[in-house]
């Protein structure tokens, strides 16, 4: 089984052409311990989740924050930061991705998305 996590790749948008500078992309991987906090934010239990000290030099960060009309995912390091709005209609797929990764991890075999959502609600709920 192994450990399944979610990885985010970010890159600057080119001014023309609607393309991205993937050759200078920033890659950040959520740890298994961080993923429930992201699910709590996606569920609306918490307003945001921010994690720092990622990468070899500990300069990378990622934040998921609820905002009017959906969420925003902000990634960065000491050289750049990228902000990507995620509309409400798309947030469902992000939540599904996190639930599937958590269900597939070695601590989650046999757990359904409902089980994971219930666990997150208990841990992060009010």
Regions of interest found by a model, annotated:
Residues 12-28, 77-84:
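A cross-kingdom feature marking solvent-exposed beta-strand/loop segments within repeated
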Residues 6-8, 35-38, 94:
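Short, structured motif recognition centered on aromatic/hydrophobic residues
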Residues 1-15:
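N-terminal "first-domain core" detector
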Residues 79-126:
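Mixed-charge, glycine-accented linear interaction segment located at domain edges/termini
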Residues 16-19, 25-48:
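Compact, well-ordered interaction domains used in eukaryotic information-processing assemblies
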